[in-house]
Amino acid sequence: MEFSAVNTIWVLVGAALVFFMQAGFAMVETGFTRAKNAGNIIMKNLMDFCIGTPVFWLVGFGLMFGAGNGFIGKIGGIATEAHYGSGMLPDGVPFWAFLIFQTVFCATSATIVSGAMAERTKFLSYCVYSLMISLVVYPVSGHWIWGGGFISQMGFHDFAGSCAVHMVGGVAALIGAIILGPRIDKYTKDGKSKAIPGHNLTVGALGVFILWFCWFGFNGASTVSMEGDAIVSAGKIFVTTNLAAAVATVTVMIITWVRYKKPDVSMSLNGSLAGLVAITAGCDTVSPTSAAIIGIASGFIVVFGIEFIDKVLKIDDPVGAVGVHGLNGAFGTLAVGLFSDGSGTDWKGLLTGGGFHGFGVQFTGMIITIAWVVVTMTIIFQVIKHTIGLRVSAEEEIAGLDSKEHGLASAYDGFAMAGVPTPMGTSVKAPVITARPSAPAESVPELPKEGVHKLTKVVIITRQNKLDEFMQAMNEIGVTGITITNVLGCGVQKGAPSYYRGVEMEMNLLPKIKIEIVVSLVPVQKVIETAKAVLHTGQIGDGKVFVYDIENVVKIRTGEEGYLALQDTK
């Protein structure tokens, strides 16, 4: 075979981008779950790739692309050019480039399940699952769809993996979440869903942007060529991929804005991924207009699908993996049968003048793939559950998997994070800032007579956004010593409910600051009135002021006590 440099480079760049999707999935899942499980999430995503790579090399590639029959490929040995160097290789692409490209696709399907089973799965059990999906489940269905199997022989079209990758992972996630059961306190006794917010939506958003960026390689490089018509096709694929994701995101934003009275951040991020998943099967064979329609539909599917799975089926999916990958993977598969313009298929879609044939082919292939994954993953998860166990104990789940599964006190050591339990016998100290904005006093006022000036401590709990203005105001009234501590307040804003992924929030830990001031000469009431004037907005959450009597103050450096200990002298 004569190799093409441009085709080889294109495939290798695509493989590198698809590999980096692992970072995107890790960030999305970490951000959408609680801080006490962040390290566990990272380890699971790492192991998906590191277990899947050798397994796919040893067995999976042969099952998927080996010369066998319509049902399963024939394993001719480990994946080497000598064993599989002919047959299924794309034109001009060396075996090793094709192997790594297919390896990263396998790992992508495996990692989808991590989010749906987050925060309560045994790490060992998850590793066993990861091995099995890369060893058997994904390669066999992949052979049917991409390896010359009986589904592909029907005329089935799944260009980059809405069905073969995402729906397979999404259905596996659904089965795993069902068998595993919901997290502790996810549902009330009467079955009402409770919101369990992720600890870092910023990290989650970073993950979505990484995935969106890498999806251009996921879909674009699936041409496995940059010669002839593939050059034009690659550009079109980039456009349809981007358009579907963008339209889906806007659609979700509008839906949540109407339903929840505010645009939901995490659901909008899921909307981006839903659009990407839905367009993946037909990105080469649908028009930009059809891609936009697919984006709109995927936005509706992800919002109402996630709500249905959570509130009606009572299936706990912390990151929305089933709604994003399972439901939209299935929809994306069917969308080819609806919107294909015939440029990448032997038929046109139902809505583009091709009749029911193409839609029927897509529907049949989808149902067969779902049935395969449901049966195999049910067996795998049930065997794991009844042997080594699938779920951690209640004690381990409450404490957090970082601590119990990995011996990690916190993935954020050195930071004060909500939801991270403090190990027994230790304490977590929040950062403390001591502010002295004024110059040291040159002289000490005359010592007041006994009992004239008492010592008073004023404590203020408030939001951080007005801290600078507050410190300036305190300086102006003569308060020069202020201690500020980052704290977390537990509460809910009455009369203005907030929502997380469609579920009304009951109570949450909110970042606040605790300001401590000890005064003697400065009148307490003046401190209080100044604080009220600066911090008041009229909104719930402005804060509270607490006033305490102090028996004595001792300055350690000089030994001075009482009033003198408060004076900032040289």
What are these regions (language model features)?
Residues 404-411, 422-570:
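Positively charged, small/polar-rich N-terminal and surface patches that mediate targeting and assembly
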Residues 1-448:
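Glycine- and aromatic-enriched membrane alpha-helices
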